[in-house]
Amino acid sequence: MSILADTEKKMAAALEFFTKEVRSFRTGKANPALVETVTVDVYGTTMRLSDLASISVADTRQLVISPYDANNVSAISKGIIAANLNLQPDVEGSIVRIKIPEPTAEYRNEVIKQLRRKSEEAKVAIRNIRRESNDKLKKDSDLTEDAVKGMEKKIQELTDKFCKQIDKMSKQKEVDLSSI
């Protein structure tokens, strides 16, 4: 695999990781990503909630979790409580309802700080990938100096592209958090 393709693949993976982290921030709107990764102890093992139930949005402030096996309702409820997400599950027969509370101004400010920190960490990861790729490029003696400069320029363009995507996602999430 070429250095450029490898660089783009690694940067895309870093962006995907950041995207998953951003989705997990609670904005006050119901979003299945809030609880998808919650772990639940069932069948003598630990499983992700998304593997045990369908998670749907009932309205802007409520999630409905429908377990594939109704016997897991109480375990799912316990798993959500244990995840410390400040969400209170309501068991109603064979489903679990979660009402998403209105976030306080203090909570929103804290989440925005976390978002900015995660955004910066993601951009640092992208820049580290750029540095590693440039180092590999310089060690590759097969390329001429002009070819190395051209590849470095392309790697920088990739870096800029991915950093802009991170900034765009971060700004959009800040708008979502601020407009609650």
Curated annotation (Swiss-Prot):
Subcellular location: Cytoplasm
Family: Belongs to the RRF family.
Keyword ATP-binding: no
Keyword Cytoplasm among UniProt keywords: yes
Gene Ontology terms for molecular function: ribosomal large subunit binding
Listed Gene3D superfamilies: 3.30.1360.40, Ribosome-recycling factor
The protein's name in its UniProt record: Ribosome-recycling factor
Role: Responsible for the release of ribosomes from messenger RNA at the termination of protein biosynthesis. May increase the efficiency of translation by recycling ribosomes from one round of translation to another.
CC terms in the record's Gene Ontology section: cytoplasm
Keywords: Cytoplasm, Protein biosynthesis
Gene Ontology terms describing biological process: translational termination
CDD domains for this protein: RRF
Pfam families: RRF
Signal sequence, start to end: none
PANTHER family for the chain: MITOCHONDRIAL RIBOSOME RECYCLING FACTOR PSEUDO 1, RIBOSOME RECYCLING FACTOR
Disulfide pattern: none
